[in-house]
């Protein structure tokens, strides 16, 4: 006996949605049972999909294409109950198969994950893991785990090549101004000021100014849709982008191509290591020495001959194994896009390895003194200052003090991406302060006076260190307190001495006054990292050309 697929009311709603005859009950899935024309049930049927010859979803039964929220965990995200776009109410029991689309190519790293190509469509089977989902590739029919941040819900705005979810204006400028991008390269990003709006950023060129980026506000309509100029409105972001890709319509230039997206952050070497991070030493190849740290050497290497990694080693006898592994535990626990990611450790024999994210440009200090950082413009330095403040704001929120914040402990990657590293002296604190054991070494020129004299470290002593880092940054790697030994520094600071404003580099008065606030003798009077991050985020915006308006 055939299964009864739906009520009379459901039939009526679907028929009203498609009065021209586009609706066929046999083409849709209700509840968990697919109903074919013979009335038989098929539990293996494709849920919520109109079965056309191409095998793709009918656009009337897809989620809102401008849904921009992050992919949700545990089946709570996405759209489970769907309805025809032309009807005000849904049809109970109509279920949409959850499909994601690949935003990047991905190569399998172990036996449990799945290789895929950009554009591949995959059905989600299990979304309970926070970083890895189990899927079936709808092209190859292979099943396996995939990294969540490499995919987006199909037909959502996140799946568009031109949409950048977590990009601020300064970062948009850096991405668009890459040399390989022609005039008209563009991206769309969420507005920093309007929670329902967006911003369109376009690379342009003018005589006397050269290449630069123009920004336009995309404003929402009350009844749905978007506009840049009031005489041109569009039902979706996709429609808006398509229109301005055919005609500039008052923009500085026609939208020529989407800005290339950087690869997303990977927090694990592979899904097998998401819950454990001890790996065999034989899987690591040390290829090139990068430098020497407080407790050992740092190498560039490969994991399983495929993945770039940085490997920090512990010299025997310089630090206890337990303390070294404590550093690893801290780095693994805290995740932020401005902190260097820890991948794994090799602790079964000496020397112990910490395997972490590789940053191609090395330390900020070397970058400023010897690398491409020597040629950075002032706005580039502001961008780096903002990123470091963002990472420290995160540590501040987690009650974690760094205790060794300096340019040598910030790493630089492509597009001047900056990340904080070296938690060798960091400690998680339950109170506001941490007092180290006697005999602990710390860098005097970067250390707050209360930490030098009384051994009391807090997030406010990190703020002091951040002020010293800013001096390093804006002087392109100059040594703090030039010509002074550590003892002289301590004595002078106690007498109220502070480094003067440099005269051999561009150094605005307002930034120097901010440094003096970071160096206040009273820790409680120093600014928070939340304030510092907001200050530098706003700094470049207020000094740049405002958002453009397109004339009606």
UniProtKB/Swiss-Prot annotation:
> Keywords of this protein's UniProt record, alphabetized?
ATP-binding, Developmental protein, Kinase, Nucleotide-binding, Phosphoprotein, Proto-oncogene, SH2 domain, SH3 domain, Transferase, Tyrosine-protein kinase
| UniProt keyword Cytoplasm present | no
Q: How is it modified after translation?
A: Phosphorylated.
Q: Where is the SH2 domain?
A: 162-259
**What is one GO biological process annotated to this record?**
regulation of actin polymerization or depolymerization
Q: Which SUPFAM superfamilies match?
A: Protein kinase-like (PK-like) (SSF56112), SH2 domain (SSF55550), SH3-domain (SSF50044)
The active site of this protein is located at: 404 (proton acceptor)
What top-tier enzyme class does this entry carry?
transferase
Q: Which GO terms describe its molecular function?
A: ATP binding; non-membrane spanning protein tyrosine kinase activity; signaling receptor binding
Q: Mind telling me which GO cellular component terms the entry cites?
A: cytosol; germline ring canal; nephrocyte diaphragm; plasma membrane
* Positions of modified residues (Phosphotyrosine): 434
Q: Which amino acid positions bind ATP, per UniProt?
A: 290-298, 312
CDD domains (UniProt xref) = PTKc_Src_like (cd05034), SH2_Src_family (cd09933), SH3_Src_like (cd11845)
SMART domains (UniProt xref): SH2 (SM00252), SH3 (SM00326), TyrKc (SM00219)
Tissue specificity statement from the Swiss-Prot or TrEMBL entry: After the first 8 hours of development, accumulates almost exclusively in neural tissues such as the brain, ventral nerve chord, and eye-antennal disks, and in differentiating smooth muscle.
InterPro entries per the UniProt record, alphabetical: Kinase-like_dom_sf, Non-receptor_tyrosine_kinases, Prot_kinase_dom, Protein_kinase_ATP_BS, Ser-Thr/Tyr_kinase_cat_dom, SH2, SH2_dom_sf, SH3-like_dom_sf
- Please state every residue range assigned to the domain named Protein kinase: 284-537
Q: Which EC number applies?
A: 2.7.10.2
Q: Does the keyword Phosphoprotein apply?
A: yes
User: How is the quaternary structure described?
Assistant: Interacts with hzg.
Function per UniProt: Tyrosine-protein kinase that may play a role in the development of neural tissue and smooth muscle. May contribute to tyrosine phosphorylation of Dscam1, a cell surface receptor involved in targeting of growing axons during eye morphogenesis.
Give the family from UniProt.
Belongs to the protein kinase superfamily. Tyr protein kinase family. SRC subfamily.
Query: By what name is this protein known?
Result: Tyrosine-protein kinase Src64B
